[in-house]
Amino acid sequence: MGLLLLVLILTPLLAAYRHPDFPLLEKAQQLLQSTGSPYSTNCWLCTSSSTETPGTAYPASPREWTSIEAELHISYQWDPNLKGLMTPANSLLSTVKQDFPDIRQKPPIFGPIFTNINLMGKAPICVTAKRKNGTNVGTLPSTVCNVTFTVDPNQQTYQTYTHNQFRHQPRFPKPPNITFPQGTLLDKSTQFCQGRPSSCRTRNFWFRPADYNQCLQIPNLSSPAEWVLLDQTRNSLFWENKTKGANQSQTPCIQVLAGMTIATSYLGISPVSEFFGTSLTPLFHFHISTCLKTQGAFYICGQSIHQCLPTNWTGTCTIGYVTPDIFIAPGNLSLPIPIYGNSQLPRARRAIHFIPLLAGLGILAGTGTGIAGITKASFTYSQLSKEIAKNIDTMAKTLTTVQEQIDSLAAVVLQNRRGLDMLTAAQGGICLALDEKCCFWVNQSGKVQDNIRQLLNQASSLRERATQGWLNWEGTWKWFSWVLPFIGPLVSLLLLLLFGPCLLNLITQFVSSRLQAIKLQTNGAGCRPRNIQESPF
């Protein structure tokens, strides 16, 4: 009876417990089921704890290149020779700001998020930029790219204004040029490159085409029914299904290819009027970086993973998804239970043949060439990558908080320094008055320290749970998964032992009563006198 109560108490608690890897494993199981993999049931799903290879990259399909949305981050820099021209330059900048509300957004966090990432499969599209003095983000080998677009390394884009054109919206006179191997693309006359309806015309006016241009079909990424088309006017990719009508899905405001090429460009605002003269020296420069707006998608550049590409980036990149290493083992294998404790104790290693998740899916062959048959699998796979993106966002918020606090405190310190210099102007400033070196002390905010303290507490909690032996929940869950199949039969046997004697006694009494009743009926029939009258002849 005590064991039954223990099972009834622990079962809801253990059912509510969720291992930290459960979201990823659940998404992996959904992915296996959606692709009809033979490993969707009766198998082991294992995650790797190795830090040498933090994950695997999976390239996006050609159709996803037409649907994943990008965004631009704009900052500007004044020309150092603006002495005496700040007033008209500010007037011009205020006009531009009204037409471009994204100016001076909070800059994204650049740099590789992960390194030593392995790209599985062949990327359908890659983009190469070779800029002088550019920021190298990583380079994919040409052998893993099906089609490679190269951004013109020598192009510089300028925007010229007259005094009467200040009220007009700025845009690129021409898009950044991209080149590709001769004979790679085919001219196609189609209605899809004339421009689809877009809800962001007034916001992203730099992408308005100056005139209509025919599309170029990418043959080795297309099929007879589905085309992948390139519009060189806007550096945009379109997907067209020839078996359907013209009213197909709209494309994003800023596509990945457009954002990647724009981020390699240079834009300067150069007013030309009787006030400024005819010089084409830009008054200020725009620095444009690009990020992927679709959560879970990343730039894959060599073995590095990026959320954003900086201004004037250089390298060879594609887009795709990232997941931690998840392996599959057949369900008939007996896996050893990991034991937490002294990590220095030797552990016996068993030769277990693990299958990578992507190999178990059987969809790698279709990513680099075709565009059909993997839509559902790719969508489910992207959910795995979103789990990583959420963790990255959390780290990014902490780093952003650090940057904001440093900027805020630096402004306060500089303001106080100016005030002290004014009070001690007669002595030549505070530094000369004290006859000391000018030093600054920036006191870090407690908000940042609280975030770091929480991270440390979480890490400490994980270490404690890993060293508590079999009493910790994580270890309990691991051995409980082995015991779980035996709980049902054990509970059934326990119930049988508890209520079996009672049931047996009831059955015995019922049988005895029925036998007694039959016996009484038989005895009564034998003692009754016969009432038979003989008929006379």
From Swiss-Prot:
Intracellular or extracellular location(s): Virion
Gene3D superfamilies hit by this protein: 1.10.287.210
Motif (CXXC): 43-46
Ranges per topology, Extracellular: 16-478
Gene Ontology CC terms: plasma membrane
Motif window: CX6CC: 431-439
Cytoplasmic side: 500-537
PTM characteristics: Specific enzymatic cleavages in vivo yield the mature SU and TM proteins.
Site (Cleavage): R350, A351
Keyword Ribonucleoprotein in annotation: no
Short motif CKS-17, span: 414-430
Signal peptide: 1-15
Glycosylation (residues): N133, N146, N177, N220, N241, N247, N312, N332, N443
Note: Ortholog of the human HERV-FRD_6p24.1 envelope protein.
One of the Pfam families matching this protein, by short name: TLV_coat
Transmembrane segments: 479-499
The keyword Disulfide bond belongs to this UniProt entry's keyword annotation: yes
Main location as per UniProt: virion
Description of its domains: The CKS-17 immunosuppressive domain is present in many retroviral envelope proteins. As a synthetic peptide, it inhibits immune function in vitro and in vivo.
GO terms (BP aspect): syncytium formation; syncytium formation by plasma membrane fusion
Cystine residue pairs: C43-C46, C43-C439, C431-C438
Name of this chain's protein: Syncytin-2
Sequence similarity: Belongs to the gamma type-C retroviral envelope protein family. HERV class-I FRD env subfamily.
SUPFAM superfamilies (UniProt xref): Virus ectodomain
